[in-house]
């Protein structure tokens, strides 16, 4: 009985992953890189990731001590405390409901297609087949990845961003991302032969396709995620004036009473 339950669990986890599709996984995908190269890349990237985390934490802890002694801290001047902070708002609750529903539908699709293991992917790579509306959910979820951070940063409070010139929170985030990929995702991918976020072999459309695709992708993602994060902060600064402009634009003129 226990063995049957274990087999059922594994079937739910990755039984629906079809290795016949290029980039999904399988023995050939798992053997794309030699174990020597895979080990070397893992040691180098994990070491750099830990260094990023430790260096950033050192600066963050030092800044925290300075703030405790009355320092100005790293809060940007243009972000101020809002009087409505701490109060529930309709827009925030609606956004929370939309995000929960989207994630719930995504989890349901993963169980229905027996690809639950893909929930471990930072960006859910799905086959977009078998069930209706899965393609739409894919894009809705990724649009929410933009809407939610910008909205929370615009609201301020605990979600106040760091200054554009500071990278003390961007560094540990990048380090944790690579540590997660080269430890948890890679180990699970090798055990299950499922290509989780392309840690076993490159996608067929990968611009860095080749034996060193992970090294090229690591450098590219470091640059792009940090640049992208700063752009999100800029958009959060613009969200307030833009929303006010759109509301004024859509507001109907008051009816004149004689």
Swiss-Prot record:
Function: Positive regulator of ferroptosis.
TM regions (residue ranges): 40-60, 93-113, 133-153, 171-191, 223-243
Any one Pfam family match given in the protein's UniProt record, by short name: TMEM164
Gene coding for it: TMEM164
Stated name of the protein: Transmembrane protein 164
Keyword tRNA-binding listed: no
Superkingdom: Eukaryota
PANTHER family: TRANSMEMBRANE PROTEIN 164
UniProt keyword annotations, A-Z: Membrane, Transmembrane, Transmembrane helix
Localization: Membrane
Family: Belongs to the TMEM164 family.
């Amino acid at each position: 009985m226990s063995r049957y339950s274990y087999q059922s669990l594994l079937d739910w986890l990755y039984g629906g992953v079809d290795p016949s599709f290029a980039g999904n996984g399988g023995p050939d995908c798992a053997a794309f890189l030699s174990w020597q190269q895979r080990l070397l890349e893992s040691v180098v990237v994990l070491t750099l990731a830990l260094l990023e985390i430790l260096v950033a934490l050192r600066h963050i802890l030092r800044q925290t001590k300075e703030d405790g002694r009355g320092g100005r801290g790293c809060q940007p001047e243009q972000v101020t405390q809002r009087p409505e902070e701490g109060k529930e708002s309709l827009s925030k609750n609606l956004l929370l409901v939309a995000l929960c529903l989207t994630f719930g539908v995504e989890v349901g699709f993963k169980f229905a297609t027996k690809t639950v293991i893909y929930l471990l992917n930072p960006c859910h790579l799905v086959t977009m087949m078998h069930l209706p509306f899965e393609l739409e959910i894919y894009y809705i979820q990724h649009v929410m990845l933009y809407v939610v951070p910008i909205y929370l940063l615009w609201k301020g409070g605990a979600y106040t961003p760091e200054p554009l010139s500071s990278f003390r929170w961007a560094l540990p985030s990048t380090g944790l991302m690579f540590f997660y990929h080269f430890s948890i995702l890679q180990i699970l991918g090798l055990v299950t032969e499922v290509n989780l976020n392309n840690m076993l072999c490159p996608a067929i459309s990968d611009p860095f396709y080749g034996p060193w695709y992970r090294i090229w992708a690591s450098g590219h993602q470091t640059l792009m995620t940090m640049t992208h994060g700063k752009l999100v902060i800029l958009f959060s600064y613009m969200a307030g004036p833009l929303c006010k402009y759109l509301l004024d634009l859509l507001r109907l003129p008051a009816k004149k009473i004689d």
